[in-house]
UniProtKB/Swiss-Prot annotation:
EC number of the protein: 4.2.3.4
Keyword NAD: yes
One term under GO cellular component: cytoplasm
Organism whose genome encodes this protein: Streptococcus thermophilus (strain ATCC BAA-250 / LMG 18311)
Function in brief: Catalyzes the conversion of 3-deoxy-D-arabino-heptulosonate 7-phosphate (DAHP) to dehydroquinate (DHQ).
Protein name stated in the entry: 3-dehydroquinate synthase
Family as reported in the entry's similarity comment: Belongs to the sugar phosphate cyclases superfamily. Dehydroquinate synthase family.
InterPro entries: Dehydroquinate_synthase (IPR050071), DHQ_synth_AroB (IPR016037), DHQ_synth_fam (IPR030963), DHQS/DOIS_N (IPR030960), DHQS_C (IPR056179)
């Protein structure tokens, strides 16, 4: 399966194919001339796939060096970025060389940020290995790192030269790691794809059913994001729809401590809680919050967070990129498969969260 991200300046393809990882070297060679490549990954994925990917690249004439860091959201910071810069400099990486991001969302976000800022930008590709990365973070060109004050507050827009997705690698994920990716999948069904929502409604929510339907789930999710990114690359309008659940979700991730609540879990919590707020304000139809919550629970996703530290969440919301003065732009779902943007006063958000 192939999806074309037809951007005006940096078009690229998303390849979705079981077993595709075996041919990663040939795929990269179809994009770049043989050169030096920095393979950026985390310590967990390195043990699973890095040597296979390195060998595949070397067999196509690339010189490969490997940089890894401790897995997890807690590593997605400027300290790790500086270590990566130092590694690239010591290994003589130039602007004619490239980066292969091999891993989940943390790896992709960090490697993309490094690629877009090292020497003012070098080429990179995404080879995502988690469901969250395959359906969401590897596509669209958003890169970034966290600070103690806010998630993804430091970042760039930088498109990869390509995305290679092998659904087979999902089999090596732990149950929690696989299920958290369904938070983003549920989001796509809600904001733009009622057929995807129907598919999710029809399957039983087990790990087996997710893996059995993985190609369709990934393809439909990627297609939603592809369409939206092509229409609005730099988040001036409809791309904000992709943030459904993320406003409160990011605040939950930050206040819990990065890594304690996984990203997809936080998105599920965020979708349910913002829907609860919007339903009370009569911005969403009665009963839709229950539908969203039931879908999330079916897949084993959380819909609430305890302890619900409202003061800390409120502070995090005021630092959100979507905050404007005393209000914050939020995404709501007036009906399944349709999204809209609404401005909610921050003080109202706090009052609703307290209830």
């Amino acid at each position: 399966m192939k999806l074309e991200v037809n951007l005006k300046q940096n078009p690229y393809d998303i390849i979705i194919e079981k077993g595709a990882l075996k041919g990663v070297g040939q795929w990269v060679k179809s994009l770049w001339e043989p050169q030096k490549i920095a393979l950026i990954t985390d310590n967990h994925v390195r043990g699973l796939y890095a040597e296979k990917v390195k060998l595949s690249l070397e067999n196509e004439g690339f010189e490969v060096v490997v940089f890894d860091f401790l897995e997890g959201e807690a590593s997605k910071n400027l300290k790790t970025v500086n270590k990566a810069y130092e590694f690239l400099i010591k290994n003589g990486m130039t602007r004619s060389d490239g980066i292969v991001a091999l891993g989940g969302g943390v790896v992709g976000d960090l490697a993309g940020f490094v690629a877009s800022t090292y020497m003012r930008g070098i080429h990179f590709v995404q080879v995502p290995t988690s469901l969250t990365a395959q359906v969401d973070s590897s596509i669209g060109g958003k890169t970034g790192v966290n600070t103690p004050f806010a998630k993804n507050i430091v970042g760039t827009f930088a498109q990869p030269d390509g995305v290679l997705i092998d659904p087979n690698v999902l089999k090596t994920l732990g149950k929690r790691e696989l299920i958290e990716g369904m938070g983003e999948v549920v989001k796509y069904g809600l904001i733009d794809d009622p057929e995807l929502w129907q598919l999710l409604d029809n399957i039983d929510g087990s790990v087996h059913s997710i893996l059995e339907n993985s190609e369709t789930i990934i393809y439909r999710s990627c297609n939603v994001k592809r369409k939206i990114v092509v229409e609005d690359e730099f988040e001036g309008g409809v791309r904000m729809y992709l943030n459904f659940g993320h406003t409160i979700g990011h605040a939950v991730e930050q206040t819990a401590g990065y890594g304690k609540v996984m990203h997809g879990e936080a998105v599920a919590i965020g979708m349910v809680q913002i829907s609860r707020v919007a339903e009370k304000k009569k911005l969403m139809p009665q009963g839709i919050t229950r539908q969203i919550a039931e879908m999330c629970v079916k897949f084993g996703l959380p819909v609430d967070y305890e302890p619900w530290r409202v003061e800390e969440l409120y502070t995090a919301l005021t630092h959100d990129k979507k905050a404007r003065g005393n209000s914050i732009k939020t995404v709501i779902v007036p009906e399944i498969g349709k999204a809209a943007i609404n401005q909610i006063p921050l003080i109202e958000m706090k009052e609703y969260l307290e209830k």
